[in-house]
Amino acid sequence: MAATAVVWQPRDDGLAEICSLLEQQISPSSVVDKSQIWKQLQHFSQFPDFNNYLVFILVRAEGKSVEVRQAAGLLLKNNLRGAYPSMTQENQKYIKSELLPCLGAADRNIRTTVGTIISVIVNIEGVSGWHELLPALVTCLDSNDLNHMDGAMDALSKICEDIPHVLDTEVPGLAERPINIFLPRLLQFFQSPHASLRKLALGSVNQYIIIMPAALYNSLDKYLQGLFVLANDPVPEVRKLVCAAFVHLTEVLPSSIEPHLRNVMEYMLQVNRDPDEEVSLEACEFWSAYCDAQLPPENLKEFLPRLIPVLLENMAYADDDESLLDAEEDESQPDRDQDLKPRFHTSRLHGSEDFDDDDDDSFNVWNLRKCSAAAIDVLSNVFGDEILPALMPLIQKNLSASGDEAWKQREAAVLALGAIAEGCMNGLYPHLSEIVAFLLPLLDDKFPLIRSISCWTLSRFGKYLIQESGNPKGYEQFEKVLMGLLRRLLDTNKRVQEAACSAFATVEEDAAEELVPHLGVILQHLMCAFGKYQRRNLRIVYDAIGTLADSVREELNKPAYLEILMPPLVAKWQQLSNSDKDLFPLLECFTSISQALGVGFAPFAQPVFQRCMDIIQLQQLAKVNPASAGAQYDREFIVCSLDLLSGLAEGLGSGIESLVQQSNLRDLLLNCCIDEAADVRQSAFALMGDLARVFPVYLQPRLLDFLEIASQQLSANLNRENLSVANNACWAIGELAVKVRQEVSPIVAKVVSSLGLILQHGEGVNKALVENSAITLGRLAWIRPDLVAPHMDHFMKPWCMALSMVRDDIEKEDAFRGLCAVVKVNPSGGVSSLVFICQAIASWHEIRSEDVQTEVSQVLNGYKHMLGNSWAECLSALDPPVKERLARYQV
């Protein structure tokens, strides 16, 4: 007779002890040290069957409170995430066998905890490792018992949310994919009388819109019918999910809703006014999604007269908006740590860049007001001035509303003006002077949120005001806006300070040299703000100072200005420790100042250089031994310090020699070039390139190491994270090549091979990397044409196409020296790409270097001579503007 498998049983004393610990852990009144309890629980985790105890307590300890059972379940969930793969098969099997019968537990808290644990296990081993799971879920869903249906739906919804693809894969032993089994049941639950089932079913199906499995694609009609049935569901959470479904379908598969577009738009317009703000917020997302999906704008156009009033109405602050709570906060209240937004330093990048870099205030809560303003902004960009007839009368009406109780309507009208400033500028431009004249007094409004929004809206009109500054009235208005924003920098209200400072930074970017006559006044206001702001707004002042330096460059390098600017910054610099995160924005600020002042930064350079070195060394120590360093490792310190050193190199030029000569920067930099963090490597290669330009001799002792490590970045996996690293490494190799010449020979073949691949797949990488690859390839070809020419046929066409996009400058001249050099070595290798060579040459507006001009002419005339009668055939394939530009070479 076969032996019966022994089922695991807990020991009573162990069970009692664990339950006691869990009770103390969750008790609000427990006087016991919670950290000690946690340590004991962690100690128990080392026993192989500890997780069996936890599942037993969750599922079977009916004499214990639901809270204790739930705590056991949550601890089990966390343990399984790390420990499940290394558990014995018996223990894995026991836990799974205990969970499934509990899907229909009477208490919903127990059911949902079980559902969470099931999804964790499925995340680890898929559904093929748990044969009993899918039949158990189907049985519960088909049971007609609410507890069982709800428990199974909860578990299924978590699987759909966390790992949707797992149900859309082939499972051994199953005739069809799990999604084909579950989707009809989920769609059926749309009609359930139980709100919880309707919500879970709809939420589960929505998870599949992005990946759109065949099962859902083939059931789209049923899905859409179900959405229309649920559209007016009494439960707000269900209506919210209906809106989310329409938004996602619009984004992912707009053709699916086109036949129903009018009904969907009518519905979205209706629920945009839903009494539940979360529903109206989800509905509001639809209008931007519609425009982004490039659905026919004329369908939306007829809705504008009804839609725009709703959006404007929703742009007013809600009574419970958190901004209202802190709107009265005055400058004397110190910032708490939680008031500080997370900050993200962007590592230095060489070349034009086409990644998004929106500072979109993502830290703040997204709400109906912001979403409605974003929708108006998008509509203004799609329809331009066509929205003005519906919008402007409402804005004027709101702006003229008097009385304190109408301040929210006035504020929303100012926000709307700012939102349409770019999209509707043609229609607004004739009235620009009146609009600005109306906004200026609002900078002194008694309501701080009106003062702050007026700052933002004026900054949105800034670039157009600057265009008008050529005429006396326009210049006078520009000055008034400038002075108005500077005055608000010194507001006593923190929100207004923040808005004014951000708005001023925007105006600085647009105005550039127009700021020069006002530099003294600007610096006095900025440094006065610097002296009075709390920590959070201080970061924005640093940004405004840095932006000012970027905008006016060497104009800042005057003793009178430096006397205002530098002493407070230096004092703050000395006050902060090397591990204080408030150093980050100051390091960034000094980077901009050092680049702007150039050699004018020399008096401040030595202590700044040494501080950067100290910070990098401290962090490299903290990485391996935090206790010895007395600081926790944070790579942002290294990135900011490397970028400031790059700024010094760029600003001081060869003057950096005296700083780096006796330092160990070379070894520190080499370490950073091999760091596992992409942003550290990105900044390290930027500094390597800057040093190569101004003081290449310093890199000489480790030259081959630098070149080898840089070349490795070009053959790495070029995902989004590594693209910018590869870009800077590529640029640095090119800078080194023109300085050390023949010494780059050992890496030429490897780099040329990598650059050829990058150029061939240019559509998969960003513009900066393509341009830098074309330039560096040209520089290597110039120095070692003999090594590059044999491989011309691999990259000639994409290389020439990339060079056509590079703007005229010294780097382009270098690249063309290389192009001409390889063609001279291997003229026949360029014949098949001759049309592209001609287009690249024609991309020059003017070649300033006489020797490059001569070499280009020799290449063209060489091919003309070599091809004889075929030359005319080659020219006939060129566009007329290209032929016209080539005519200057007498070909």
From Swiss-Prot:
**Main localization category:** cytoplasm
Q: In its UniProt entry, what is this protein called? A: Transportin-1
Q: Which InterPro entries match?
A: ARM-like, ARM-type_fold, Importin-beta_N, Importin_beta
Keyword Repeat among UniProt keywords: yes
Which GO cellular component terms, listed alphabetically, does the Swiss-Prot or TrEMBL entry include? cytoplasm; nucleoplasm; nucleus
Q: Name one GO molecular function term.
A: small GTPase binding
Tell me the first and last residues of the signal peptide: none
Locations listed in the record: Cytoplasm; Nucleus, Nucleoplasm
The record, for SMART domains, names:
IBN_N (SM00913)
The top of its lineage is: Eukaryota, Viridiplantae, Streptophyta, Embryophyta, Tracheophyta
- Organism expressing this protein natively: Arabidopsis thaliana
Q: Where is this region: Disordered?
A: 326-352
- Function, as annotated: Functions in nuclear protein import as nuclear transport receptor. Serves as receptor for nuclear localization signals (NLS) in cargo substrates. Is thought to mediate docking of the importin/substrate complex to the nuclear pore complex (NPC) through binding to nucleoporin and the complex is subsequently translocated through the pore by an energy requiring, Ran-dependent mechanism. At the nucleoplasmic side of the NPC, Ran binds to the importin, the importin/substrate complex dissociates and importin is re-exported from the nucleus to the cytoplasm where GTP hydrolysis releases Ran.
GO biological process per UniProt: import into nucleus; protein import into nucleus; RISC complex assembly
Sorted keywords for this record are: Acetylation, Cytoplasm, Nucleus, Protein transport, Repeat, Transport
Q: Give the highest taxon in the source lineage.
A: Eukaryota
| Start and end residues of each Importin N-terminal domain | 37-105
Which regions does the record annotate with the repeat HEAT?
14-42, 47-85, 94-127, 133-170, 180-210, 223-250, 262-289, 305-382, 390-421, 433-460, 478-511, 519-552, 560-598, 606-654, 665-696, 704-741, 749-785, 793-826, 835-867
Q: Where is the composition biased (Basic and acidic residues)?
A: 333-342
One Pfam family assigned to this protein is HEAT_EZ
Q: Which family does it belong to?
A: Belongs to the importin beta family. Importin beta-2 subfamily.
Q: Which PANTHER family match?
A: IMPORTIN BETA
- Which chain positions lie within coiled-coil regions? none
What is known about its subunit structure? Interacts with RBG7, RBG8, RAN1 and RNP1.
Write down which residues bear the modification named N-acetylalanine: 2
